[in-house]
Amino acid sequence: MKFSDPHLLPAGLERSLRFYVTNPSPCPYLPDRKERKAFTNLAIPEADALHNVLSQSGFRRSQSIAYRPACTRCNACKSVRVATREYDISRNDRRVIARNAHLVRRPVAAQATREQFRLLKSYVVTRHDNGGMSDMTYRDYVAMVGGSPVQSLIFEYRDGPEPDAPLVAAAITDVLRDGLSMVYTFFDPAKTSQSLGHYLILDHIRHAHDLGLPHLYLGYWVKGSPKMDYKRRYKPLEVLDGDRWRPLRDDE
């Protein structure tokens, strides 16, 4: 396995890593294609160091597993990240931020709550009813949130400063050496006028910048996929090309 910066790995760890590949399954992004993933276990003492290197090399985290696409005849899934220091905020971005100025972001430990789960179920039923999370139970959500062996937080967005103000949105977020990584976000699907999905990304860009972190990792961009193509709006967007990150061109 080739890493973008293997020097960040603890001595000897690269030789002991084991990677596996899943069997082919239907691609969730492009029709008539199959996907495979390479993955490894993050539940080791050096989890944070490994997670940082793997994230820079195009991996994503799901519970205690780090994975990335390993398809044989397709490389449409591109790892992308926003350059937070150079982000070009648009007039529409400012309007979305203004519409959500009343929301209060609060970082909490990566521990599941019933309140979060109710919001998640409402979001999934409305937005992704045919997806793999439609039958998620509270126990599944506990495992999803609490199964992280790396530095993770949940950013809760509440409709006011009171601790018991209504929960409007939440973002499961990993904290990396060079940025924040948005693992999963969900929000009140009834509040369509607030563009909450867009706002959560904008707020993470701003928060990463305030923390002095140069990147916000957004996962995979897939050109032509309605589920993933929206990410190209966040400019400047960097794409992992082989083992190096470069700006995504407007004509791509």
Swiss-Prot record:
InterPro entries: Acyl_CoA_acyltransferase (IPR016181), Asp_Glu_LeuTrfase (IPR017138), N-end_Aminoacyl_Trfase (IPR030700), N-end_Aminoacyl_Trfase_C (IPR007472), N-end_Aminoacyl_Trfase_N (IPR007471). Its main location: cytoplasm. It catalyses: N-terminal L-glutamyl-[protein] + L-leucyl-tRNA(Leu) = N-terminal L-leucyl-L-glutamyl-[protein] + tRNA(Leu) + H(+); N-terminal L-aspartyl-[protein] + L-leucyl-tRNA(Leu) = N-terminal L-leucyl-L-aspartyl-[protein] + tRNA(Leu) + H(+). GO terms for molecular function: arginyl-tRNA--protein transferase activity; leucyl-tRNA--protein transferase activity. Belongs to the R-transferase family. Bpt subfamily. Functions in the N-end rule pathway of protein degradation where it conjugates Leu from its aminoacyl-tRNA to the N-termini of proteins containing an N-terminal aspartate or glutamate. PANTHER family: ARGININE-TRNA-PROTEIN TRANSFERASE 1, ARGINYL-TRNA--PROTEIN TRANSFERASE 1. This is Aspartate/glutamate leucyltransferase. It comes from Hyphomonas neptunium (strain ATCC 15444). The lineage of its organism: Bacteria, Pseudomonadati, Pseudomonadota, Alphaproteobacteria, Hyphomonadales. The gene is bpt.
